[in-house]
Amino acid sequence: MAVRVLVDILFDRHTIIQYRDNGKPFLVHGKELPEKELKALSIAHTRRFACIVTAPGDKAGIDLECLSRNFEAVAKKALGKEEKVFLSDNLQQRTLQLALIWCAKEAMFKYMSQEEVDFSKQMTVAPFFPETEGVLSGTFQQQNGITLLLPLCYKKLDDHFMVWVTG
């Protein structure tokens, strides 16, 4: 419900959201949104926040993560060797890094909208030092072998990180 309200506020009118077979949301053509204005839509939420990102065309990805979550499972499941190498020994910094890496990979996953993605092998986030906002450098290796470089914007909101990518 909060997402529909956000979309209506963003477009200053009632807007229809539909979902593709893979669950990816999109904004519908119609009186509310003429064909030339078709927008990609990505949605994320936690208990406290809901967020959306739109972009022309069909690619947009956003994720939101609460920092109170235990991200150690992420380190085992979703990080590649090159990402594990730059993780801090400081627990607080490590948590911020893991949260941002996971958030970035979820945003890339939504952006690419491909099935059966191996988060540890097909997606990489370049080394970084966590700030309150910034841009991460991500790569996504598609199943056809083509690698895309993706700039991932991020912002810290209280005890959450939000990461988004559009293109």
Whereabouts are the PLM-identified features?
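Core catalytic alpha/beta fold that binds nucleotide/phospho-ligands
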Residues: 1-167
